[in-house]
């Protein structure tokens, strides 16, 4: 079978759908020139493939090696329907490539009048100069030039030339496609890993930053007493199920390495510059999580969980809390598969009881409905996102576990929280597990909240 880039170029929707259904495939990977599948589908005008990729979570503002976004390519080739779709999904309309050109520069240069008018109507600036000091208006022929000027003035644009400068867009992070070869290699040669910095250590192991095959990664060393052949066999069986590349809100385990040759069994995953949601909310990173960002994170997490809940069987021993959610370079929240526990890791121990449903604290794992218990954990995350506080911060884990399970301890919703979020929190935290909603029911609710 041809590769995914060819299928997207040729608009082979059936093949693309089959490829997307395989959890080992990462739809945000790039080819040798940094073109993602979405770049190719937009360039060639393959509307149905574009729809499918966007619905599965393709990154809209991803850039190839020349810093072109999919909108640059759709605009240069005059695919009006795709341009409108990308705008609808919040494409950066004034994105600048390595020549300083915006999508509007190309629509004007190639004479795609309707596309150029659509872009201006949606906020594309007519007077941004590229590296060669040319604006989109300079690139347009008559009568388009006059139409765009008039349109821009009506919309309140200032027609004074905005000079090109490198730093103009440095506020926006450049999102590149990921290296597509990483999902092909499950077993890892320990000698190829370089460890640079120890990030953390706790009872279950050590966390290191390192590099592998030219990529920044996180290496998790598991401290396991009495490493036996049985445990080694379980490890080999369990970690490949955590290599889920096919959803943008799930962070896969890239691979693993046995002990020996490694000093401890290790799993590796992509390095996330912002760390976990817990770091972002409670440990003072550079950015502020306002209500809009909080809802966006909640939406990301709900989408990731809705996907994980479609898997049969469910991923066992996955605990949803703010430490097991990572924040990607483009501020996307991703559920970390490297935080799933292995069957031989302290069975029966609760690491973060503040996020655990009361019934899960009282009963054996096989006696509860895991999907409903996850929804409770999500409600605690919602509480944490809007209050920016650690749940039950003044109690020890032991006390939290006892009080939530036996004394009815619950997070209290402070005044001043948006009524929509308040209501959602309450339905997700229903005392009766059977009455809690499913994730696919709350994704559309959060999507509407984002648009408000």
From Swiss-Prot:
Protein kinase domain mapped to chain residues: 193-446
Topology within the bilayer: Peripheral membrane protein
Transmembrane segments: none
Keywords assigned: ANK repeat, ATP-binding, Cell junction, Cell membrane, Cell projection, Cytoplasm, Cytoskeleton, Magnesium, Membrane, Metal-binding, Nucleotide-binding, Nucleus, Phosphoprotein, Repeat
Classification via Pfam families: Ank_2 (PF12796), PK_Tyr_Ser-Thr (PF07714)
GO cellular component: actin cytoskeleton; cell cortex; centrosome; chromatin; cytoplasm; cytosol; focal adhesion; lamellipodium
SMART domains xrefs: ANK
UniProt keyword annotation of Phosphoprotein present: yes
Sequence ranges of the ANK repeats: 2-30, 31-63, 64-96, 97-129, 130-174
Binding site for Mg(2+): 339
Subcellular location field: Cell junction, Focal adhesion; Cell membrane; Cell projection, Lamellipodium; Cytoplasm, Myofibril, Sarcomere
Residues binding ATP, per UniProt: 200, 202, 204, 270, 272, 279, 341
Subunit structure: Interacts with PXN/PAXILLIN (via LD motif 4).
Family label: Belongs to the protein kinase superfamily. TKL Ser/Thr protein kinase family.
Protein known as: Scaffold protein ILK
The organism of origin for this protein: Gallus gallus (Chicken)
Name of encoding gene: ILK
